[in-house]
Amino acid sequence: MICFPNAKINLGLNVVSKRPDGYHNIETIFYPIPVRDALEIVASDRTCFTQTGIPVDAPQEKNLVIKALNALKTRYEIPPLEIHLLKAIPFGAGLGGGSADAAFMLKLVNDFCGLDIHPDELEAIASTIGADCPFFIRNTPVFATGTGNQFEPVDLSLKDYYLCLVKPDVAVSTPEAYSMVTPAAPETSLKEIIRLPVSEWKERMVNDFERSVFPRHPVIERIKDTLYEGGALYAAMSGSGSSVFGLFEKPTHFKEQSLFSDCFLWEGQLS
């Protein structure tokens, strides 16, 4: 049985306040996009895991697919499985690829083994793996608050817009992203901004992390500028980076123009 875990982008990100536990409260919009890994499981006489595609520099036991399987094993009887992950979503990009793999693993094993686990329980299990992991269980647009772990569904469709996603060969650490951000409640909530036409987002929707990341990694800012120069209605860094996306009314041709040739590049229409 096979499934295709998809990435997400952050539409805006406001760092609202610092918490007593040292973490930060944020607000952002998670929106699913059709940039996908492939995850397959088959019955086997022993559990084994293999991975191809984009290399991930992490030991197997720390892979979130394995963490998802182990989380299920503490609650249910799971037979031995042969697992293969084809990695196509860039990691360290603010796209939630690892969390998507884990959430889709929970759903895949649930279906494969006929466990009939309710989505609410799958979300609860996913929450033990990562803050944004539960989002991928239902995989629909949400207004995320708290540490990015509290979700409220939003009525938002970007169907028929064109997406260009660019990820340079740059890594951004979370402490680095927060380093120059002063937490503050936004004047206008993202829930209000997304009700406006996309063409009005540029002047109203911000990602607070850009003010920390851009001075340290100017290549990321240049990508955003290039997307706007290419006709983007809205462009922004996703999460803490380092990927940048642009939303367009028409198909983009950055690959044909040999722009971003040293970056991961995905262009396509949203559905």
Swiss-Prot record:
Any idea which UniProt keywords this protein has?
ATP-binding, Isoprene biosynthesis, Kinase, Nucleotide-binding, Transferase
* Pfam families with a match to the protein in the record: GHMP_kinases_C (PF08544), GHMP_kinases_N (PF00288)
A GO BP entry is: terpenoid biosynthetic process
Sections of the chain in a coiled coil: none
Question: Which residues participate directly in catalysis?
Answer: 8, 132
Catalytic activity reads: 4-CDP-2-C-methyl-D-erythritol + ATP = 4-CDP-2-C-methyl-D-erythritol 2-phosphate + ADP + H(+)
- The residues that the entry says bind ATP are 90-100
Pathway(s) it belongs to:
Isoprenoid biosynthesis; isopentenyl diphosphate biosynthesis via DXP pathway; isopentenyl diphosphate from 1-deoxy-D-xylulose 5-phosphate: step 3/6
Give the EC number(s) under which this enzyme is classified: 2.7.1.148
Please give the function described in this protein's UniProt entry.
Answer: Catalyzes the phosphorylation of the position 2 hydroxy group of 4-diphosphocytidyl-2C-methyl-D-erythritol.
The Swiss-Prot or TrEMBL record describes its family as follows: Belongs to the GHMP kinase family. IspE subfamily.
Q: What is this protein called?
A: 4-diphosphocytidyl-2-C-methyl-D-erythritol kinase
This chain's source organism reads Parabacteroides distasonis (strain ATCC 8503 / DSM 20701 / CIP 104284 / JCM 5825 / NCTC 11152)
